């Protein structure tokens, strides 16, 4: 099989540059296009140079329709509005869409799922093996411990991150809620301030820290009456997520239309 031809969305950003480097280092994939927002000062610049690599002749462009004509997939870690715009084009072109964008609303996710009867989408709040293993463990622990154990999720990210809680924190919250057999939407405490009253039994709490250059730290604590258990993961470099996204794209190439997750990619769906 020939190399998979991939487009990097948000190619001028930090994650986009990491994705470009991951593709350059890979076996089995080549860069086919570099997408950037209309009006960006990055348009026209060489994607390789922006990523700290030799020039590769791929210029940043805002025209996804044109560049996707000869592509097999798109790696998308952008913002919700951009991702939703990309969904329709990727589905129309019949290319794999790997989505790592966070901050998506319920209606955004509904749009994404609406194309998966005819398109291949891999979507995850986190593309790393460690975090996906953590989510599997969190689900099991939440199921094993009763409601006398309160669940709290704490995440730390760099000062430039624009959404909170992080997609990974919400992913871990969904795992905990699934273990408890409850709806996260109905049992999430996303912020506490002032006189909040006693903690509501069964809820899942979130706290978000922002500062420095942290690539992503997450912990899930189960706090019981006589003991507490904390499970955690620390990301050392965002290349971790770039390599995970590339793995997802290569795995999805040739798959039947559907809505897949990193748990599917990593063989963790049944854990």
From Swiss-Prot:
GO biological process: diaminopimelate biosynthetic process; lysine biosynthetic process via diaminopimelate
Residues holding (S)-2,3,4,5-tetrahydrodipicolinate: 158, 167-168
Enzyme class, spelled out: oxidoreductase
Subcellular location(s) per record: Cytoplasm
Record flagged with keyword Plastid: no
Record's catalysed reaction(s): (S)-2,3,4,5-tetrahydrodipicolinate + NAD(+) + H2O = (2S,4S)-4-hydroxy-2,3,4,5-tetrahydrodipicolinate + NADH + H(+); (S)-2,3,4,5-tetrahydrodipicolinate + NADP(+) + H2O = (2S,4S)-4-hydroxy-2,3,4,5-tetrahydrodipicolinate + NADPH + H(+)
Enzyme active site: 157, 161
Pfam families with a match to the protein in the record: DapB_C, DapB_N
Molecular-function annotations in GO: 4-hydroxy-tetrahydrodipicolinate reductase; NAD binding; NADP binding; oxidoreductase activity, acting on CH or CH2 groups, NAD or NADP as acceptor
Known pathway: Amino-acid biosynthesis; L-lysine biosynthesis via DAP pathway; (S)-tetrahydrodipicolinate from L-aspartate: step 4/4
GO terms under cellular component: cytosol
Main localization of the protein described in the UniProt heading: cytoplasm
Binding positions (NAD(+)): 10-15, 36, 100-102, 124-127
InterPro entries cross-referenced by the UniProt entry: DapB_C, DapB_N, DapB_N_CS, DHDPR_bac, NAD(P)-bd_dom_sf
NCBIfam families: dapB (TIGR00036)
Function: Catalyzes the conversion of 4-hydroxy-tetrahydrodipicolinate (HTPA) to tetrahydrodipicolinate.
Protein name per Swiss-Prot or TrEMBL: 4-hydroxy-tetrahydrodipicolinate reductase
Gene this chain is encoded by: dapB
């Amino acid at each position: 099989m020939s190399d998979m031809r991939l487009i990097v969305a948000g190619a001028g950003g930090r994650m986009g540059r990491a994705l470009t480097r991951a593709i350059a280092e890979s076996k089995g994939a080549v860069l086919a296009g570099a997408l950037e927002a209309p009006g960006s000062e990055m348009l026209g610049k060489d994607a390789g140079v922006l990523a700290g690599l030799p020039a590769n002749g791929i210029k940043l462009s805002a025209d996804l329709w044109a560049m996707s004509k000869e592509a097999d997939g798109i790696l998308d870690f952008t913002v919700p509005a951009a991702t939703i715009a990309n969904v329709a084009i990727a589905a129309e072109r019949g290319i794999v869409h790997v989505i790592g964008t966070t901050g998506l609303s319920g209606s955004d996710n509904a749009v994404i799922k609406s194309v998966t009867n005819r398109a291949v989408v891999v979507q995850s709040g986190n593309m790393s093996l460690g975090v996906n293993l953590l989510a599997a463990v969190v689900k099991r622990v939440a199921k094993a411990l009763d409601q006398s154990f309160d669940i709290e999720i704490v995440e730390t990210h760099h000062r430039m991150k624009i959404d909170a809680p992080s997609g990974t924190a919400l992913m871990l919250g969904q795992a905990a809620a699934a273990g408890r057999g409850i709806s996260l939407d109905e049992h999430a405490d996303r912020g506490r301030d002032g006189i909040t009253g006693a903690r509501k039994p069964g809820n899942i709490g979130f706290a978000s820290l922002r500062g420095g250059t942290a690539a992503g730290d997450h912990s899930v604590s189960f706090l019981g009456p006589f003991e507490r258990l904390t499970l955690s993961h620390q990301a050392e470099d965002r290349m971790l997520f770039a390599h995970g996204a590339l793995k997802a794209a290569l795995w999805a190439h040739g798959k039947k239309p559907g809505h897949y997750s990193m748990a599917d990619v990593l063989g963790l769906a049944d854990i």
